[in-house]
Amino acid sequence: MGAESLVAGLAIIGIVIVVSALLSGLVDRSGLPQVAVFIFIGAALGPAGFGVFDMTLTSPVLRVVATLSLTMVLFTDAVTLNIKEVRRRAGLAFRMLGPGTILCAALTALVAWWLLGIPPALAAILGAALASTDPVLLRGLLRRRDISLVTRQALQLESGLNDVVLLPIVVVAIFLSGQHELPSASFPKIGFGLFILGPGAGIAIGLMAVAALDLIRKRIGVRRDYESLYSLGVALSAYAAAEAVHGSGFLSAFAAGITIAALDVELCDCFIEYGGVTAEMLLLFTFVIFGSSLIWTGFYGLDTRTVIFAAFAILIRVPVYLISMIGSDVDKHGRLLIAWFGPSGLSSLLLILLPVFAGVPGSDQLFRICALIVLISVVVHGSTPMLFARLLGQHEPEAPPKPEAPNEPRPLPVLELVQPTGTQSITLEELDQLQKSGEQVILLDVRTERSRDTSDSQAEGSIRMPPENVVMQARELALPKEAWLIAYCA
């Protein structure tokens, strides 16, 4: 049985990687919700399909995968934040988190208590979980270039910061739901572990990690792709360190990510380039696990009150965020998009699993309600990028190709002039040789916005090309296909 479980696990991991790679282009162009694809893959592999595996709330594997996923979600949220942008947009961040996230959570909890008769502590957990926005669903919308910069920044700030606001609510409510078993002296200890030990351990691990990496960089050097794996190791180490001292491992992972984001821009960019893909694979793998059977429990015992509550939980965001955006510099269309697009997804499911793992009575009901709302949100919010693309005319006509100049004899073959040091790099001496030989050479500044914040200097004659949607940008810039395109990112 152990061997069969291992084979099934490896098969699922392989399917996630292969399918996500094959569908990446289709998802980007069509706006198709990637999450929905993996939920249905899970359904096909689950008991209703091929019966490869059946996951329940008591499965030990679920706890391991959920813990890893929530750790990666919080760390990724933190490490991808642009700290300078957060400071610059502090007022906007407050609007998104204060009147926005917290008020949505409070109103949802109130209606859950009033309409569904859920105890106050459990209602608070449900409200907080449903107020969390899903990073995977949100990523597809943030990649669109026809959304204004301030709108993207607002959604990024909310996605990066709202989980760290909601997680303490969930943790405190879990303890309150079982407070009859806890002495009053336990609450200061719980608060100390949650708000001091957890973040403190994360900051300490982050500081040591950045210092060690900086030392090794200067003396030996570190490969860029391995720096992303290094950051993943930091996330897991921060979680373990906090749990070892009875702190919150999840808040520790977030604190470690914030520390890295504040101190080491290059490591953050490495994580976005390489580690971010690894983390996303884990999150998609988690969707497959939920899709096997767990998420479909949302239809069990469905009644009119639950349907009304689900509609309220999804729609309450619209008036709350429209009001919170009054007086901001976000335009009307941006406000409507922000107010509408608050998808519930993996983050909501992971937060709602915390009381399940803690053995809180009635938490299985919370999971079923949350699963139903996540399914609705995947359909409703997941189709938003696709509808948005159609409304704004995503498929812009391609610029006609420039007439090619007649071939002219070149003084020397390029291969005789340049012996590349690698398939992805070129030295300054080789660049100089190319330019002197008469070759058409175009320098591309492909630094991320975060990297440019440290220095706005740009190589003379280079063209700015952010590292997103590069094919579309190349067409817009009419870059000649026969030219040498040399990109630099530092």
Where are these regions (language model features)?
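Short glycine-centered, acidic/aromatic-flanked micro-motifs in structured strand/loop junctions
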Residues: 128, 489-490
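A generic secondary-structure signal marking the coil-to-beta-strand transition
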Residues: 41, 71, 424, 440-442, ...
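Hydrophobic alpha-helical segments and helix-packing faces
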Residues: 281, 304, 424, 455-457
